[in-house]
Amino acid sequence: MKNIVFMGTPSYASKILEEIYKAKFNILAIYTQPDKPVGRSQTLTPPDVKKLAIDLGLNDIVYQPKSLKDSGVKEHIKSLNPDIIIVAAYGQILPRDILDIAPCVNLHASILPAYRGASPIQSAILDKNSLSGITAMAMNEGLDSGDILAFSILDITGMNSYELFDKLSIMAANLTIKVLNEYKNISPIKQFDALSSKCKKIKKDDGLVDFSVDSASQIWAKFLAYYGWPGIFTKNGIKILDMEISDLNGEVGKILGLSDDGFILGVNGGSILIKKIQAA
């Protein structure tokens, strides 16, 4: 299990690619999403995986098709004759004809079958789970429904999404190397579909908080889950950059007290201490 095609896009995937490189597996090709315009100036920016590939001197084997169904993609991967295809937050669905070329292993950021889909990290935090982890899965045509090859579990209590992304990417990188080294001896386990759950792609509007509807614990969960992007904000566009739960009770939307750290605001069934805000 030495010859690898890698598919991934964000920093989560780049850490996995880096460990594969350090472990001296033969990386035949790196597939990642096309460069995208970023910021107000719309500067064309490469994804994290491409940035790492350039740093490692692997830019000659980077491929960025708009779609894996594009002409020549299947033929190119097939011509490489990979032993395995490693997939981590690539951002495109692998079509059947690519899944058939070689075993495809996905590193999904949840303990499957929970949180199949696009936002497992944020969803676990939103649901106030104490545990999450990484599942190495043999890919099929379903949504994160393939057989389980290995998994690792982590206590996520109190973590925001940025912290959890970082820890899970390291965990995923280590699990990838383990799976690559032990692949031939692994006995896959079918997922128990009856216990499965799905999670949606995060949208900017998901960060909206309503003090008359959301409880203090719900606002805190949103703050942790949407840390960085989209963040949490009120209907008039004020963004809450730092906060914690308070133990005071009072009228919703009213300032209940002041402290050296900020001000305490009444919300549905409780209050929050707002430490830092940003105007619209």
PLM region descriptions:
Residues 244-260:
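A conserved acidic, glycine/proline-rich C-terminal tail/linker
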Residues 1-228, 257-280:
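One-carbon transfer enzymes
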